[in-house]
Amino acid sequence: MFGVELVPCIQTLAHLHNALKWPGMDKIRDSADILQPEKEETYQFIEKLLSSVKENFSTNRVHLGMDEAVMLGLGNYLKENGYKKGSLIIREHCNRVVDICRKLELKPMIWSDMYITANSTGGYYDLPENTDCSKWEKPKKDLGLVYWDYYHDDTRTYEKMLDIHAQLSDNVIFAGGSWIWNGISPNYSKTYACTKAALSTCKKYNIKEVLCTAWMDNGAETPVDALLPGLVLFAHLDFHGDYDETILKQEFRNCTDGEFDDFMALDNFDSLFLNTKENKEAQNPSKYLLYQDPMLGIFDYHVKEAGVNTKSYYQNIQKCMKECAKKTGKYQLLFSFYEKLAAVLSDKADLGMCIKSAYDRSDRAALKDISQNVIPGIICNLTDMKSSREKNLDERCKAIWL
C-alpha cells in the first residue's frame, strides 16, 4: 500500500536535442530536438528505448513525454511529405508508440499539451472556458494524459483545464511541482499557492493520481533537498481534506527529520522586493544579483527603485541560515551553503552601486576599502560557497547511490 514504484520518464518525440545533434541521428530528425514521425527508423529507435525500459524497471508503467513539440512536422518532415496538421501527426505518432507499448506490455502516459496546442491556435492554458473538444483528435483510451500545471493559483484555471481534459480522455493524471527551478533558492510561496489550488480542484474532479515534479531548469542550482516542503505538502493534501499547517509541520518533522520553518526561511532569498508578499511571479534576485557583473549593473535599477538595503537584508538571512545549520545535523550542509550564499549577496548585491557612488564622489578612501577589503571578502565567501555546494552535492549523491 505504501510502497515506492519507480516509473521511468523518457522522451519519444521532442526535448531530444542532445541525442539528435549527432550525425548518426540524421535519418530520424525532424528538427533540432524533435524526432521525425512516420519513419520506420524512428519507431525502431523508440522500440529500442522502450525495450531498455522494460528490461531495467520492474514496473510496467512508462511516461513517454511528448511535450512541447511546437515545431512538429515543420522540419525535414515538411520537406519530405508536405504540410500535415499537427493534430493528425501527434495522434498517428502516439498510436504507433502505444502499439509498441502494447507489444512490450507497458502502460504508457504522456504530457497532454500537444493534444491541446495541436488541436487549437493558442497556447496550452489559453483556451476559453466551455471549449468544445468534440471534433478534436483524441488519444487512445489506454494512453494516460498528464495535465501539467505549476503556475496558477486560482481554482478556476484548473477547473477549465480539467474540463477540457475530461473531453479528451478518461485516463487523466495531474502533475504539479515543488519549485526548485526558480534559481539558486526554492520558491515555496508559489509552490504552496499553486498546489493548494490544484489539488483541491483535483479532489473535486476525482482525479486519482497526481505527480509532484521537481524540474532542474536553468542550471539545476537549487539543492534537491529543498524540494521537501513541496513534496510533503502533496502528501499532506492527499491524506487530509484541508490544509492544516500545524499538522503539516509535525508530518514534515516525522518524514524528513527537518524543521518546516527552517526550510521555509529559504523563501526569503528571492523575496527581496516583496515586503512579505508571496513570490507568485517567480522573481529570483538571489540569482541575478549573484551573477551580474558589478561594473555593468544590469539589474541595479531594481535595487535602486525598491530602495532596499540589500546588505542588512541578506545579513539577516545569513544569521538565520547559520542558526538553522546549527540545529540540524542531517541538513547542516544545505543550510551552510545558503549561509555562504547570503554572505556573498550581503556584500555583492549593491557592489556596483557602491563603486559608482564612491567614484562619483571622488571618494578614494571608499574605493580603496572596496578594492582591498570588500571585493577580497566577496571572493573568499564565493570560494566557501562553492566548496559548501560541492560538499553538499557529494554527500547527497553518496547517500543516494553508494
Predicted feature locations:
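Substrate-binding groove of N-acetylhexosamine-processing glycoside hydrolases
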Residues: G3-E5, Y43-E55, T59, K79-L402
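Short, solvent-exposed turn/loop segments enriched in Gly/Ser/Thr/Pro and often Arg
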Residues: I10-H17, G65-A69, M114, A214-D217
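Active-site groove signature of glycoside hydrolases
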Residues: T12-L13, I28-E80
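Short, solvent-exposed loop/turn and secondary-structure capping segments
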Residues: H17-K21, G75, T121, T157-Y158
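Short connector loops/turns at beta-strand edges and beta->alpha or beta->beta junctions
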Residues: K21-M25, D67-M71, S178
